[in-house]
A protein has these predicted regions:
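C-terminal accessory region of SF2 helicases/translocases
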Residues: 149-214
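A short beta-strand element within the Helicase C-terminal
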Residues: 114-128, 152-156
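Conserved nucleotide-binding/hydrolysis micro-motifs of P-loop NTPases
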Residues: 53-56, 80-82, 109-112, 128-132, ...
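Conserved SF2 helicase motif VI
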Residues: 131-154
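Conserved Helicase C-terminal RecA-like lobe
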Residues: 1-102
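SF2 helicase motor core recognition
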Residues: 104-120, 139-147
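Short, surface-exposed basic-aromatic patches at helix termini and helix-loop junctions that form
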Residues: 62-68, 121-122, 144-147
Length: 214
């Protein structure tokens, strides 16, 4: 059963392997429509989460080169000391009238134990983590007590699709269900195949073409 689900995940990932450029374009289009709808910045804020530092650096370069950098873009990642992180978090939590920051680009170093909900109810997962708990931790940065908006908007633009149905090849929700089932198997059985499990993120993101089951 594990092998069958992994084969299906691999198929979705392979169909989306060549869509990295469209994912970046989808992010830029979303930011333009939601944060600069008339060419001017509004008061909305968004958090962009990546799992890997390399992805973090890649999307940072794209954002900066398309008018979404400078004082509007803040970063949180594992390479920052606690002392360096505090003013960044404070700027993002401050009123939009007092702080120009509108986009927070973060790795999972910022996904646990940090409150970011004061003036933000939008979050984008650039990469879907293998462990669903990590995704829940990310969402919990804004989906928590103290959130002032009625809705919290979460987007997974893995294939550069629209915000209503973004996914790997249109299968984002299927992937999440499969991952949760695999995680449940690990809880019930003690583990998922130790050779297959570490390859999951690569399959989902398309960086692996096939599973090595040796």
């Amino acid at each position: 059963e594990q092998r069958g689900m992994l084969d299906e995940l691999r198929g979705w990932a392979q169909r989306a392997r060549n869509q990295a450029d469209s994912k970046a374009k989808a992010i830029l289009d979303w930011l333009t429509a939601n944060l600069k709808p008339d060419g001017q910045w509004n008061d909305r804020r968004v958090i962009l989460f990546t799992e890997y530092r390399t992805t973090h650096q890649w999307i940072h370069q794209i954002l900066a080169s398309h008018g979404f950098g400078g004082e509007r873009l803040a970063q949180l990642h594992g390479g920052l000391s606690q002392e360096d992180r505090e003013p960044i978090k404070a700027a993002f939590q401050a009123s939009p009238q007092d702080s120009p920051v509108r986009i927070l680009l973060a790795t999972d170093a910022a996904s646990e134990g940090i409150d970011l909900q004061n003036h933000c109810n939008r979050l984008i997962h650039l990469e879907i983590p293998y462990n669903p708990n990590v995704m829940e931790q990310r969402n919990g940065r804004i989906d928590r007590h103290g959130q002032r908006e009625k809705e919290v908007l979460i987007w997974h633009p893995v294939d550069g699709g629209d915000a209503g149905g973004a996914s790997v090849g249109g299968h984002g929700e299927d992937i999440l269900r499969a991952l949760r089932k695999l995680d449940s198997m690990r809880a019930d059985m003690g583990s998922v195949n130790p050779v297959i499990a570490p390859q999951m993120s690569g399959l989902i993101e398309g960086s692996l073409k096939d599973l090595d089951t040796r």
